[in-house]
């Protein structure tokens, strides 16, 4: 009982100071923080107590020896020299966990093999049978660490990692290990808050790990109480009477703690996550103590009779598009915490620390942590008591502008039945955004494009303004954060603007006049529907009856749909992108138009296609729409393209394909574009830019340029 051992509790990096504090509370004398763990000298009972009670540790290791080692033979000899017969019972199995390397030992599997060989040969040398290896569930798990020219050998008393409490089967969304979750709660001050009778709420609880760990803490239930198998269970040095005494004490404390009444609540809007949380709650034996409910972030509200802790582990977002979407989520989270949780303690655990600025909260403490290899931060803050959410002068001005724009557009929107429109377009210099509203068949969405700030602008100020803007937009449009889709507009090169920024595959349907279109608000910079050409498409639909229609640089084929619905005799849709041609096909089918001989889709480089068709099929089309990009140097194109430089050739080739009484509608978006004088002289040209700029783009009359061209 009084024999002292070298002991080590491993933990996630960043939790070492908290683990020192926890072990000290468990009676450990002079615990010392080391990298990814805490060391101490103590008796066997202190090690067993740590196995049973530590919420933050991942493993408890009992050290046997530390010796200099240079090569594989040294590994073998160090292992063979230890009296393994004092630790491994005859006929029992073993496994070796090896960590580290040097110039001679480069692979952990090889290192583990040499240590195992030393152990096996030692057992045979003292007359015991050769032990077998069982990597899944060994009777004795040996821990070997090679670092700094020294080999540390020990026994893993925990066996399976201590984070496995037994209640979590499926991870759900971005699973958080139980010991790291407990560490977050410890750092956020939950033990003190629970002692004072405060509640715990996770408004984005996922599979419920944070709430369940908080419940185990508050109810004084040892995290290892439900575990049957331990690393010391078959260890020859195990003293069962010590373990029984510790378990009996833990059961008494759990019974006493179970009489406490606290509000322990988790919300999530994902029904699958809530189902997982409920299953985990059942396995944890906390059915009557923890409440999980499907609820949106905007509906989250305080629980219990006293201020408590609201703790959140939002999604991390690995791709650019996901990170941009999280800006909206963080802004909405901060707004909800400020508006509804005054007097509470708050904590947000983020795998993208730069997003914490979008909370708009004054952070009292930041803790740098590692979730596996990922650098993370826990931000802790005290939420001030306040009435209505106070906005900055700039945010108030933005809200006023949105209201003004809506009032100006309301009558037109109602009269024309417009379901997708631009509400705001950089009207205020400090809020350089474009805001488009989509009234889809399944509800309202906001598509927000931030124009990238110049380097001279302070990044934190820019993040603050964006956060304010997103809050104002969501509140004005009365939509939740999942319906505000943020993009960042940077200077695009070549086909960059058409490359995906995310891969959700989510689509919605929006109405435009007689047509219905699929839009994607997340995966690309653009949505599949250029709103500034709404009038142009409607005019094409009116002009198409009985005509042969050609749509060049067709994008998602929206103009083709209008032409087909308008009674076009036939249509052909040409674009280089297979993605957008597939989208065009879906748009046709959505409107009851069957692609085929009458409505052809052709994947081709429009420049090469025009050059080939102009000579072979003159006068083939009665109505042509051509809306080329400003610039392109796509590797799939036979040549680079600049609309100012190349539009004369492009127009002349298109005019060769136009019937004598036909109409070519040419448009482009290049700022400062001017139509070639020779083209204007050779054809009957009429600029219709003003006629095709809709009221929602009146503030930006140069969003596109548009002409009608006919043969003279």
From Swiss-Prot:
Pfam families: Methyltrans_SAM, RlmL_1st, THUMP, UPF0020. Its EC number is 2.1.1.173, 2.1.1.264. Residues 46-157 form the THUMP domain. The keyword Transmembrane does not apply. One of its GO terms (molecular function) is RNA binding. It is found in: Cytoplasm. It catalyses: guanosine(2445) in 23S rRNA + S-adenosyl-L-methionine = N(2)-methylguanosine(2445) in 23S rRNA + S-adenosyl-L-homocysteine + H(+); guanosine(2069) in 23S rRNA + S-adenosyl-L-methionine = N(2)-methylguanosine(2069) in 23S rRNA + S-adenosyl-L-homocysteine + H(+). One of its GO terms (cellular component) is cytoplasm. InterPro entries: 23SrRNA_methyltr_KL (IPR017244), DNA_methylase_N6_adenine_CS (IPR002052), RlmKL-like_Mtase (IPR000241), RlmKL-like_Mtase_CS (IPR053943), RlmL_1st (IPR054170), SAM-dep_methyl-trfase (IPR019614), SAM-dependent_MTases_sf (IPR029063), THUMP_dom (IPR004114). Keywords: Cytoplasm, Methyltransferase, RNA-binding, rRNA processing, S-adenosyl-L-methionine, Transferase. Belongs to the methyltransferase superfamily. RlmKL family. Specifically methylates the guanine in position 2445 (m2G2445) and the guanine in position 2069 (m7G2069) of 23S rRNA. This is Ribosomal RNA large subunit methyltransferase K/L. It comes from Alkalilimnicola ehrlichii (strain ATCC BAA-1101 / DSM 17681 / MLHE-1).
């Amino acid at each position: 009982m009084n024999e002292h051992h070298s002991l080590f509790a491993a933990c996630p990096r960043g939790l070492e100071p908290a683990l020192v504090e926890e072990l000290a509370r468990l009676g450990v004398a002079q615990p010392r923080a080391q990298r990814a763990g805490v060391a101490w000298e103590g008796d066997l009972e202190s090690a067993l107590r740590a196995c049973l009670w530590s919420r933050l540790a991942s493993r408890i290791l009992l050290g046997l020896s530390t010796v200099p080692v240079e090569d594989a033979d040294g590994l073998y000899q160090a292992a063979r020299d230890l009296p393994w017969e004092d630790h491994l019972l005859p006929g029992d199995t073993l496994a070796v966990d090896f960590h580290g390397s040097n110039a001679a030992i480069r692979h952990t599997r090889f290192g583990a093999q040499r240590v195992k060989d030393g152990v096996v040969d030692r057992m045979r040398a003292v007359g015991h049978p050769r032990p077998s290896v069982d990597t899944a569930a060994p009777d004795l798990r040996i821990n070997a660490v090679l670092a700094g020219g020294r080999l540390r050998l020990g026994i893993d008393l925990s066996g399976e990692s201590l984070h496995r409490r037994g209640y979590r089967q499926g991870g759900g969304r971005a699973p958080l290990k139980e010991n790291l979750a407990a560490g977050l709660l410890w750092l956020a001050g939950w033990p003190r808050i629970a002692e004072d009778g405060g509640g715990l709420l996770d408004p984005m609880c996922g599979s419920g790990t944070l709430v369940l760990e908080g419940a185990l803490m508050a109810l004084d239930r040892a995290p290892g109480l439900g575990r049957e198998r331990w690393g010391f269970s078959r260890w020859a040095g195990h003293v069962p009477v010590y373990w029984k005494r510790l378990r009996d004490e833990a059961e008494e404390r759990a019974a006493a703690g179970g009489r406490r009444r606290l509000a322990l609540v988790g919300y999530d809007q994902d029904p699958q996550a809530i189902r997982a949380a409920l299953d985990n709650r059942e396995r944890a034996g906390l059915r009557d103590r923890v409440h999980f409910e499907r609820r949106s972030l905007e509906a989250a509200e305080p629980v219990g009779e006293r201020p408590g802790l609201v703790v959140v582990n939002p999604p991390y977002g690995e791709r650019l598009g996901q990170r941009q979407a999280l800006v909206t989520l963080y802004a909405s989270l901060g707004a909800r915490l400020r508006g509804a949780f005054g007097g509470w303690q708050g904590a947000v655990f983020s795998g993208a620390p730069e997003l914490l600025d979008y909370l708009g909260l004054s952070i009292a403490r930041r803790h740098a942590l590692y979730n596996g290899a990922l650098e993370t931060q826990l931000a802790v803050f005290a939420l001030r008591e306040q009435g209505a959410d106070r906005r900055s002068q700039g945010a108030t001005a933005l809200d006023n502008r949105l209201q003004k724009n809506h009032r100006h557009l309301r009558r037109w929107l109602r009269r024309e039945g417009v379901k997708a429109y631009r509400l705001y377009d950089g009207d205020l210099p400090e809020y350089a955004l474009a805001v488009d509203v989509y009234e889809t068949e399944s509800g309202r969405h906001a598509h927000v494009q931030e124009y990238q700030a110049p380097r001279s602008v302070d990044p934190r100020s820019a993040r603050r303004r964006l956060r304010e803007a997103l809050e104002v937009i969501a509140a004005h449009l009365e939509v939740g954060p999942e319906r505000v889709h943020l993009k960042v507009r940077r200077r695009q090169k070549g086909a960059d603007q058409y490359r995906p920024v995310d891969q959700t595959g989510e689509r919605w349907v929006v109405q435009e006049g007689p047509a219905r279109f699929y839009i994607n608000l997340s995966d690309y910079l653009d949505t599949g529907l250029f709103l500034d050409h709404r009038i142009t498409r409607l005019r094409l639909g009116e002009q198409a009856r009985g005509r042969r229609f050609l749509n060049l640089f067709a994008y998602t084929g929206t103009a083709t749909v209008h032409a087909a619905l308008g009674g076009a005799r036939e249509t052909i849709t040409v674009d280089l992108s297979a993605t957008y041609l597939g989208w065009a096909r879906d748009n046709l089918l959505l409107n009851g138009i069957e692609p085929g001989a009458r409505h052809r889709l052709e994947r081709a480089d429009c420049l090469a296609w025009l050059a080939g068709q102009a000579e072979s099929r003159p006068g083939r089309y009665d109505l042509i729409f051509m809306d080329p990009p400003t610039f392109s140097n796509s590797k799939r194109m036979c040549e680079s393209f600049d609309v100012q430089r190349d539009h004369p050739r492009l127009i002349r080739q298109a005019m060769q394909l136009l019937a004598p009484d036909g109409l070519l509608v040419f448009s482009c978006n290049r700022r400062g574009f001017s139509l070639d004088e020779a083209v204007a002289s050779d054809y009957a040209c009429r600029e219709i830019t003003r006629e095709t700029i809709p009221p929602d783009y009146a503030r930006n009359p140069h969003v596109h340029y548009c002409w009608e061209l006919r043969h003279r």
